[in-house]
């Protein structure tokens, strides 16, 4: 089970300060998780400029130009934001047994290390 999932609110904890044009301290929602490369795509964070070649689409409209998109950032550079305190926190797990259809299953529940509450 991943500590950071799609839809979580995270805060950038490393990198250049905001005064210098960086993203440290900014918060954003996780748009996508790349588990094979340990990276996450965060809304409004690590924006890069992409230049694409000018061409024509099938409908005859012009394509290409300069666009600004988000690039993935490494998981170690972000921290999950605790929903109750709105501050970055570490994530732990708590094992809980759930009974469903007569069978008991053990599930892992994400817990904030700072407050001890479920996330």
Curated annotation (Swiss-Prot):
Source superkingdom: Bacteria
Coiled coil regions, renumbered to chain: none
Keywords, sorted A to Z: Ribonucleoprotein, Ribosomal protein, RNA-binding, rRNA-binding
Record has Membrane as a keyword: no
Cysteine-cysteine disulfides: none
Subunit structure: Part of the 50S ribosomal subunit.
Annotated function: One of two assembly initiator proteins, it binds directly to the 5'-end of the 23S rRNA, where it nucleates assembly of the 50S subunit. One of the proteins that surrounds the polypeptide exit tunnel on the outside of the subunit.
Family listed: Belongs to the universal ribosomal protein uL24 family.
Protein name: Large ribosomal subunit protein uL24
Species name: Paenarthrobacter aurescens (strain TC1)
Gene (UniProt): rplX
